[in-house]
Amino acid sequence: MKPDRKSLLAVFNVLFTAHGPQYWWPGDSPFEIMVGAVLTQNTAWTNVEKAIANLVNHDKLSPAGIVAARKDHLANWLRPSGYFNVKAARLKNFCRWYIEAGGFTALSKVDTQALREALLAVNGIGPETADDMLLYAFDRPVFV
């Protein structure tokens, strides 16, 4: 028997009421959490932390900062996370979409399923990354 959405949400609510928010995913802002979700693809979290620190040290940990960064500079800052050229392109794609979509405030108002579909339409955002973003950045009741 496959559980339905209503049953899963009921279980989620019982667990959430009993245990509260877990703050499992590190990050100082929802945007940083989303950047981490892109960068953690195929690498260890310690490497992601180094890449995020590089963005912070170069004052580029913002959607506009990432979009404005030269691709070769961005790739170099992301080098610790592996596949740095691919991740630089994916992160720029994501940030362009994020800005065009109106940023966190506008995206927060979008229905969960519609937001998931929009995230999946961004080149480089797959199902697990989209679900990470929904759960940890947008506080949506989804399973990863």
Regions found by a protein language model. Name each.
Residues 2-144:
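Catalytic cores of DNA base-excision repair glycosylases
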